[in-house]
Structures are given as C-alpha cells and as structure tokens.
C-alpha cells in the first residue's frame, strides 16, 4: 500500500479552532497540532452536525445526520443493526479498500466503549 496515503482522522472533544495557534490563537502554543495542520488537510469551513458529541461523531462516522442515523443524544451508541439498516461507516469503506483501520481513545459511538 505504499502508493496510498496514510489517513489519520482526529476526533477532538470540545476543541474550538480559536484555541489553536495554527488558526491564530496567540495565547497558546500548539506545535504538534500545528504540524499536523501544516502537513495534512485542514477543513476551514467544516461545521459539526450536532453540538452534542455522540451524535456529531456518529454523523462523521456514517456520513448521515443525526435524524437519519438515529443517534440524537449521548445516551445511545451506533445502532446495533446499522449494517442491516444499510449504514456503512467510512472506516468500513477504507477497510474494504485494503486499509488497516483502528479506533483508539474515547469514542462513545460503540455500545461497548
């Protein structure tokens, strides 16, 4: 897979862009995030689908808004029947394309997390 790029998708929890020096925050130094931003792809016009973390993460994971994927609060993880319901996550799509995928850290979108 040497001809494919590595993909690292960071899901920060409650991190505002005005608290990052790469976006102009002068009161804080964030060199590691700045390096990732400089060498990767930044989405300057990206907006969260939900102000609540679990629905927002599920929306990113599924490509569907909270109403369509069925996760509208922090009390539910991803639907246990999501595959039977025809929902495919982008990590699954990457895995199907031959990528090794992994989820590390606090996610709260799987019921066993």
Model-derived features with residue positions:
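Formylglycine-dependent sulfatase
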Residues: 1-113
């Amino acid at each position: 897979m040497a001809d494919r790029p590595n993909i690292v998708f960071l899901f920060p929890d409650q991190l505002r862009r005005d608290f990052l020096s790469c976006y102009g925050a002068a009161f804080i130094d964030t060199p590691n995030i700045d390096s990732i931003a400089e060498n990767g792809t930044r989405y300057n016009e990206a907006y969260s689908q939900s102000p609540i973390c679990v629905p927002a993460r599920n929306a990113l994971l599924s490509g569907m808004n909270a109403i369509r994927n069925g996760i509208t609060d922090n009390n539910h993880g991803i639907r246990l029947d999501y595959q039977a319901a025809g929902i495919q996550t982008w990590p699954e799509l990457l895995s199907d394309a031959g990528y090794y995928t992994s989820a590390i850290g606090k996610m709260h979108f799987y019921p066993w997390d």
